A protein has these predicted regions:
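RNase H-like, Mg2+-dependent phosphodiesterase core
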Residues: 1-264
């Protein structure tokens, strides 16, 4: 007699009534964390700026972006960094965000509010914030290099690693040749799950936006009670949608988004 249990085949001998348990070969899909690439280029004089956003999809509040330059040496622990969506502990992602800020060569986080989102649309608002984050990170890095006399201004270059499939190029004046040039870039779909610089940017942007949402809900308890903003972060969860239907929208809602259009 044979019968299958969840993890074994049970065989009973009809003569001696011995029961033998033979483990089955169980194929379980393992959620293996992909190893993120440290660099897009191995050139030590090309400093890569990872860029990502947080809060592009919600019906509510600001969109945040971050830009990060990670060091090209063995001092930075890339194993700590992963796509911000892969963190399930608030404490852990905040610890990693602090590590990034303390050990990155340069970084910057910026945002555009819901009014700007409604005025110029979410794509352009995100691009505007990305440009701010990139240029401030670049400015910060240039100052740091000059202050420490580490490199001449023309001895290094930048390369932008942008999460997503679209980027509005940044044009700047090259003081060496007095010509307008464009910062080179690559857009990478799912980049926050491929390169640590982009993943680091995704972490900083998410932590800043989550903190903004948390502070806003503390100052305005109705946001949590009526709309569940403290937990859904402004996305279209059921409690949020039901709250809009019952109470209308707040001054922080994006009036050009989805159901919000019906309550302007």
């Amino acid at each position: 007699m044979k019968s299958d249990s969840e993890n074994a085949v049970i065989v009973a001998d009809s003569d001696e009534e011995d029961i033998i348990i033979i483990p089955k070969n169980v194929n379980r899909a393992r959620n293996v964390q992909p190893v993120l690439k440290k660099y897009f280029s191995e050139d030590n004089k090309t400093f890569e700026i990872g860029v990502d956003e947080a809060g592009r999809g919600p019906l509510f509040g600001r969109v945040y972006t971050a830009a990060v330059i990670l060091p090209k040496d063995d001092k930075f622990d890339h194993s700590k960094v992963k796509d911000s969506k892969k963190f399930h502990s608030k404490k852990k992602i905040e610890e990693v965000a602090t590590y990034i800020k303390e050990n990155a060569v340069a970084w910057y986080v910026s945002f555009e509010d819901e009014k700007t989102v409604d005025e110029i649309n979410i794509l352009q608002a995100t691009q505007k914030s990305m440009h701010t984050s990139i240029l401030e990170t670049r400015k910060q890095f240039n100052k740091k290099m000059k202050d420490h006399n580490k490199l001449e201004f023309t001895d290094y270059s930048y390369y932008l690693l942008i999460d997503g499939n679209y980027f509005n190029p940044i044009t700047y004046l090259n003081k060496k040749n007095n010509k307008l040039e464009t910062l080179p870039f690559t857009t990478i779909e799912g980049g926050d799950n491929k390169y640590t610089a982009i993943a680091a940017a995704s972490i900083l942007a998410k932590v800043e936006r989550d903190n903004y949402i948390g502070e806003l809900c503390e100052q305005n308890p109705d946001l949590a009670e009526k709309y569940g903003i403290d937990s859904n972060k402004g996305y279209g969860a059921k409690k949020h949608m039901d709250g809009i239907k019952e109470h209308g929208i707040t001054i922080w809602h994006r009036r050009s988004f989805g159901i919000c259009k019906n309550y302007v």
